[in-house]
Amino acid sequence: MTSDLHQRRRPPTEEELASIPWLVLLLPKERERAINALRVGDAEKGDFVCRVGRPVTYWFGTVSGLLKMSTDNEDGQTMTFTGVPPGGWFGEGTALKREDYRYNIQALRASVVAGLPLETFHWLIDNSLGFNRFVMNQLNERLAQFIAAREFDRLNNPDLRVARNLAALFNPVLFSGVGDLLRITQQELAYLVGLSRQRVNEALIHLQEEELIRVEYGGLRILDLQGLRTRMIDRRNRDNQSKDIAL
């Protein structure tokens, strides 16, 4: 945690503990140790949870709100990797290797962030089969997500970028707290996708017309996650075929 957030840390409430997906996978003694070590912080909009170059001290998860994972390139431009909605835990690779962070995590709105101290994280890795399975599933799912992100972003198709980001944010493995309703504004989605709010709105209209999502007050409801993923693949294949014909 950054210094300001670290100073605001506190023990989690029962409701907050109930939202942490991996706790139910632990044996009673493991769960007791984890709960005693867990701390939460109330992050304000713009607060950094972790920053590039800082040593890892916690494994973090989003209890409520919305975070973004990003880095700055040599030109000072920000490149956003993904959003982290409720139920999402991140940085397990960095925690496993005890590395410095290679990315920033920043709150896009007021959020509650949970942190498991690094030493407790490694104790669970060494002693808990359930915890190991959760972390391995996280790593595998995140790898697949980033491979897909690189593939779709190369097509430079705004509608596909919005669809890909939505499919990622509704991922039930990585973000179990989202369900079928994601609390997000169009401006927040624009920050994550790297497009203008107007262009994001156009893409959402297209997706809603295809009955894949529904735009609701304060959020987006997924109607057909598999259909959204299929649309991405079909559109990608059509774009690739068009490029082949042009060549």
Predicted segments with their positions:
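Cyclic nucleotide-binding regulatory module and flanking cytosolic helices
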Residues: 1-45, 94-96
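Cyclic nucleotide-binding regulatory domains
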Residues: 22, 47-109
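Cyclic-nucleotide recognition modules
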Residues: 31, 80-140, 144
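Short loop/turn motifs at secondary-structure junctions and domain boundaries
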Residues: 32-33, 49-53, 173
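Alpha-helix/helix-capping structural signal
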Residues: 64, 119-120, 141, 187, ...
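Polybasic "coupling" helices that flank or enter modular domains
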Residues: 108-109, 126-194
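Phosphate-/nucleic-acid-contacting segments
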Residues: 169-247
